From Swiss-Prot:
Function, in words: Potential calcium-dependent cell-adhesion protein.
Alphabetical keyword list: Calcium, Cell adhesion, Cell membrane, Chromosomal rearrangement, Glycoprotein, Membrane, Repeat, Signal, Transmembrane, Transmembrane helix
Gene Ontology MF annotations: calcium ion binding
Quaternary organization: Interacts with CTNNB1.
Extracellular side: 29-844
Intracellular or extracellular location(s): Cell membrane
Record protein name field: Protocadherin-11 Y-linked
Residues covered by the Cadherin domain: 58-171, 172-281, 282-387, 394-498, 499-602, 603-705, 709-827
Biological process annotations from GO: cell adhesion; homophilic cell adhesion via plasma membrane adhesion molecules; positive regulation of Wnt signaling pathway; spermatogenesis
Region annotated Disordered, chain positions: 1052-1112, 1321-1340
The organism's place on the tree of life at top rank: Eukaryota
Residues spanning the signal sequence: 1-28
SMART domains: CA
Amino acid sequence: MFRVGFLIISSSSSLSPLLLVSVVRVNTTNCHKCLLSGTYIFAVLLVCVVFHSGAQEKNYTIREEIPENVLIGNLLKDLNLSLIPNKSLTTTMQFKLVYKTGDVPLIRIEEDTGEIFTTGARIDREKLCAGIPRDEHCFYEVEVAILPDEIFRLVKIRFLIEDINDNAPLFPATVINISIPENSAINSKYTLPAAVDPDVGINGVQNYELIKSQNIFGLDVIETPEGDKMPQLIVQKELDREEKDTYVMKVKVEDGGFPQRSSTAILQVSVTDTNDNHPVFKETEIEVSIPENAPVGTSVTQLHATDADIGENAKIHFSFSNLVSNIARRLFHLNATTGLITIKEPLDREETPNHKLLVLASDGGLMPARAMVLVNVTDVNDNVPSIDIRYIVNPVNDTVVLSENIPLNTKIALITVTDKDADHNGRVTCFTDHEIPFRLRPVFSNQFLLENAAYLDYESTKEYAIKLLAADAGKPPLNQSAMLFIKVKDENDNAPVFTQSFVTVSIPENNSPGIQLMKVSATDADSGPNAEINYLLGPDAPPEFSLDRRTGMLTVVKKLDREKEDKYLFTILAKDNGVPPLTSNVTVFVSIIDQNDNSPVFTHNEYKFYVPENLPRHGTVGLITVTDPDYGDNSAVTLSILDENDDFTIDSQTGVIRPNISFDREKQESYTFYVKAEDGGRVSRSSSAKVTINVVDVNDNKPVFIVPPYNYSYELVLPSTNPGTVVFQVIAVDNDTGMNAEVRYSIVGGNTRDLFAIDQETGNITLMEKCDVTDLGLHRVLVKANDLGQPDSLFSVVIVNLFVNESVTNATLINELVRKSIEAPVTPNTEIADVSSPTSDYVKILVAAVAGTITVVVVIFITAVVRCRQAPHLKAAQKNMQNSEWATPNPENRQMIMMKKKKKKKKHSPKNLLLNVVTIEETKADDVDSDGNRVTLDLPIDLEEQTMGKYNWVTTPTTFKPDSPDLARHYKSASPQPAFQIQPETPLNLKHHIIQELPLDNTFVACDSISNCSSSSSDPYSVSDCGYPVTTFEVPVSVHTRPSQRRVTFHLPEGSQESSSDGGLGDHDAGSLTSTSHGLPLGYPQEEYFDRATPSNRTEGDGNSDPESTFIPGLKKEITVQPTVEEASDNCTQECLIYGHSDACWMPASLDHSSSSQAQASALCHSPPLSQASTQHHSPPVTQTIVLCHSPPVTQTIALCHSPPPIQVSALHHSPPLVQGTALHHSPPSAQASALCYSPPLAQAAAISHSSSLPQVIALHRSQAQSSVSLQQGWVQGANGLCSVDQGVQGSATSQFYTMSERLHPSDDSIKVIPLTTFAPRQQARPSRGDSPIMETHPL
């Protein structure tokens, strides 16, 4: 029987097709030991096989006794080798069977196709696998190598040999003798010897048959535990020895194969006397182990059997059964009497590892006893490893011949090492000597591939004797060695080598043909024809050279010219006679030595240069370029001008021509001369060229405008002009010629509304759209005239002033507007039109009329309510209070005033000027430095009384008459800020919240920078402001107009402190106060307002009362209106009008500076921005500049101007928590102005020092550093400079501040404002900036 084995088919990733077919070394004598050992090693070590070498396994099944040339398989298809990528192979794919020299392979393989066929050798399974157990499969193994080396692969092919029924079962002997006692009972069984069949499976013994038994005996077949079938003879009838003592018959045995095979034997049965008892073994199964190196005669085991009989029937005889193999009978001896088994011959585990011994014990009877002895032969390291070399490269006389240029990892031989020992005694390693270019790479268990690990070189080593060593792992280890010889075949693998890789040689030009230049030589390390060298010129070699093929001599065959070719670079080849031939090369550099055989050459025969006429002296005219094909000094060219021309010079090295003269095209248009070029050769050569220089015109004149000739002219454009009409034409001329004189026009600035367009060629300015109201006024158009000169165009610009209006009624105004527009910066897309054009005034009038109408309705309603609460006689008393007011003009304007003096005296009565003083007193309790000190500011204001009378009320649109009692009600507030509000920050005693009412016909007017005056309401208490440009200061103030000799004080004491001013009404008590509902003065919110009646049923504040005080909730300032000093005008002289008033004019003798607690100096301090005075400083919002402007007695309009910080519009600021104020700005139409408080940007403010004889005056100080004045409270200007208000003003000199408004001509409706200046008595005033003050004229 055979045991089932296993098969592993492995596919390597490299798919290197080489199949070594290793023929299994099987022989008939020791095949059993060999296969058992190989199977064990394969099973244990196969999983450790390294497959990276391209090893695979493939199984095929064949039947034994197969005839010759039967196709078994096709490796190319079965291994899918057709899927291998198409690589560039040195040779075609080959299949090579690898086997040991002397072996006869059972199969063959076609090298080209991979087809496997049987050979003529007989395939006998019973011979190949005689020693293996019957239950295992029988395999035959070979190795096939797939070549070439690029796709090398080693494939192990295992052929499973199937059994056929080629053997008949046979009995151990042809005659079988058996004895049966005569008293044997019926159905008694007696064992017969079994037949043996070499085939396995169904082809083995299957049936026994008894022939001619005469029905006395029968036959039965039983199966042993080992699977063997044993025949048994059955007694069917009683036997009688006296009747018949011998029976003869036949026994037939058959197998199950096809065709069925059988055999027979003669069975002879002898009937004997009775033997009642049978022998019995103590142990029926015994297993023992014995080493294979046990000596002969060694006891294996001792068998014991007993028999109950006595005498002869009790004697036992031991023997081997006929089922014991011949090998076992040969190796073991059984003592028939004692039953001792001993070793008859030396054991070999590698041949048979175990033995089954069936022992019979018989007492002479027919029923012997049976016992099975299993002998296991244990291994000892008694076998040295064996080395089996199977060549992949066919050897020649046991020597492998390898070419020296074989690639790396070329497979040379398959080395198989084996060891018949088991376990570690059979583990074998194989290795080679060191320092050889070969290595062993494992592929299968105990199989290695010998391959080259480095390139072979015949020139260094021609032969190799490789010693292979194999050693097992036993103790002590056993080893074996084998030799493998390799001879290296020379190949043409060495190219010829030149002694130098780069050769340089020089030769003069103009040489003689045939001159030998040099000789080249090379060597070759190969031998024979591979070392024979021929010399050749490379493909890049010029035809001027030739080379001797054998000697390598280089020759120049042509005349060389350095100017054509100054060097040659080519290769020379050395080629051997090998197959294929190898070549190498050397680079040859031939340098040609120059000779001076060429003259300098100009790039042009004649040079023409064009230079501009404005080229400066010694400028660059042009560059002369000259070449010389020679080299070195022979090509060093020097340039010079012939005929000693002094007008021009030339650089001898660079060739740059420069003029020594200034060009003038009108005098001479061209210059001609010759330039000489000479080289530096030993025998020099030279040449010359003509140079012509032409002088050309340049664009050096820009267009000049002749119309308009300057920027200050203007052109009138009627609003009715139709679009497309040419309104003006600009004309510019250019003194250049040609394209340099062609002029083109364009508008580059102004004209933001695209109202005008210009023709770029004619310069005609055309009106593009119909003019509407918004287009009226002055338009400033920036026109550019540029020529078409190259490379840079020149241009000029002019401002064209177009005045869109029906007519020019005031040329002076237009000229002034033009002048102002010229001073303004001009940028593209900037509107040039004047913002103060009459059109904008018309829009303002329209808007003001609508807003004023709404305001008047509200004001009338509030006024009616207020007047109903006042006594009727107050109106008459207020109208009678008129005072003459005198004024001293600004010294800087005295000449202008004196020029107009006579004219005004003829046409006008003397001016009635009203002088009022408004005093603001404030106690800052929260300032630790003030300590209750009070600051009082007194401001005298004068206004021409006849100004209103001269206003043209007929021609100017208005809604009121000059004698209107309330001029301010018709004005409209243009301030972008909310109404003026004052909120108290701290709670105050209600008994001090008293407001002194003034007469109902008082009006407060605000004056802006363009003489536009406005009033916030027609209430008795209205707020006026005066707005100025950013560069000027603004002085907003609240004013209560009053009759002459009247004083009104607004006072808000701290806590329970009473006012120091005499109200004239006795003490104030809360019980006598009545609340009112009308609007508060100065735009104060109506929070708590108290009205108190006098015993004469008159409201407080009438014209007959003494100076009184009015308390405003939340206001911590005391505003006092002082009586005017009319008697001061009696002391004035003509000198006062020119040089200013003296102390005699201002101060009566009765007035004492220290007589009153309120006679503290009050000053309006304009602190210079750079002032660093370290005195008490009050924040600007606290310091208030107040100017009170009185109108003529008709309307008694008072303008109040306040100057906050420069960037703010007019506002009244109180430092929190005293009073919080918001700004109120009025810009009424200019036509409605009845009073003017104007401060131009450069107006010169004068500082007034307090006089000791005048209780309260106003001191103003203007900053000399900036025209924009910032206000700082706490400083006044005295005779000795700046001094603190807390200290008072002690100087005696008096500076004065006045503002005068007057008319220059009766028909002129505009109002002139003469700025004031600072001057001392009897001193000429110094103008601030310029010789005369700047005068601003309102358009109306």
